[in-house]
Amino acid sequence: MRKYEVMYIIRPTVDDEAKKAVIERFNNVLTSNGAEITGTKDWGKRRLAYEINDFREGFYQIVNVQSDAAAVQEFDRLAKISDDIIRHIVVKEEV
């Protein structure tokens, strides 16, 4: 199993309940595919360096996971489809 850092930005127009639901849904995507979440960080609402989909701000969420590639690939696939996530990146951590 490898260690990954997943960072995603939730669009700023969602309310607090919907934001919590998005975070829980994507954490469940990782854990249901065999990933172990080793840490999460909520960076809160931050200004973006440039406009993404007409948004100037977004809610940043960072998740550290230990998993096989399949869980991260499933997260990546669903994050691309989701309208609530405006940008995401998955980085494999060096050992």
UniProtKB/Swiss-Prot annotation:
Keyword RNA-binding: yes
GO molecular function, one term: small ribosomal subunit rRNA binding
Organism of provenance: Bacillus pumilus (strain SAFR-032)
UniProt name for this protein: Small ribosomal subunit protein bS6
Family listed: Belongs to the bacterial ribosomal protein bS6 family.
NCBIfam families assigned to the protein according to its UniProt record, in alphabetical order: S6 (TIGR00166)
Keywords: Ribonucleoprotein, Ribosomal protein, RNA-binding, rRNA-binding
Keyword Metal-binding among record annotations: no
Gene Ontology CC, one term: ribosome
Top-level taxonomic group: Bacteria
One Pfam family hit: Ribosomal_S6
UniProt cross-references to HAMAP family, sorted A to Z: Ribosomal_bS6 (MF_00360)
GO biological process, one term: translation
Function according to Swiss-Prot or TrEMBL: Binds together with bS18 to 16S ribosomal RNA.
